[in-house]
Amino acid sequence: MEQKGEAVSVEELEKEVEIMLEENQSNEERKVEYAFVLNDFFKQDFLDPEEVLDKNKGKAARETRVYVCLKLEYENNTFLIPLRRDLAGMPGHPLFQKACYPVPSENKPDAGLDFRKIIVVNEPSLYRIDEAKISAKQRNTMQDNFEVIKNLAIDYIDGFKKAARKNRQKREPLYKYSALNNFLEELGIK
């Protein structure tokens, strides 16, 4: 006499394997890629360089700083969303929900992804994909919420494009300081 749970049919095993493969595939699809912007990127001529570069630092410091970004592919462009350590001025502001995504760590409680500083880097030689040296908490936050982050970033990009087509992006508070002002051609605006 068989006891419950001892014998498993081939059909049950096949179904279990199929479920595991689907879960593995969906995890691979959600794989977060971290990109590091290389120095040559900052040597380009930008229309609005202050919004791409750290305006509080000199040119040499800007070119040597390591920018950890979350990579996003959308509409034949590669977007890099910078992980910034201090978004303290943003959380209380009403635009925070549309412009940033909090990714705090114990050492950096105000860290997050800043959609205002998204850059377009379609040339793979200007960035490298590598494992980011960030806290496990930050890594898990981005991995677990990648689809939400992706959708928020796409909403921001689409909103910017809509404003730019009307030549209003410099007047709308959400886009006034956007790094995307430097990538109008890549976005199909010009």
Describe each model-derived feature in a short phrase.
Residues 10-29, 102-190:
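C-terminal terminal-subdomain/extension
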Residues 36-38, 81, 119-121:
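Residues in well-ordered beta-strands of folded domains
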Residues 67-70:
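Short beta-strand-centered aromatic/proline hotspots
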Residues 41-42, 87, 125:
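Residue-level detector of flexible, active-site-proximal loop/helix-junction positions
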Residues 5-64:
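GIY-YIG nuclease catalytic motif and its immediate N-terminal context
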Residues 58-62, 73-111:
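Compact nucleic-acid interaction/catalytic patches
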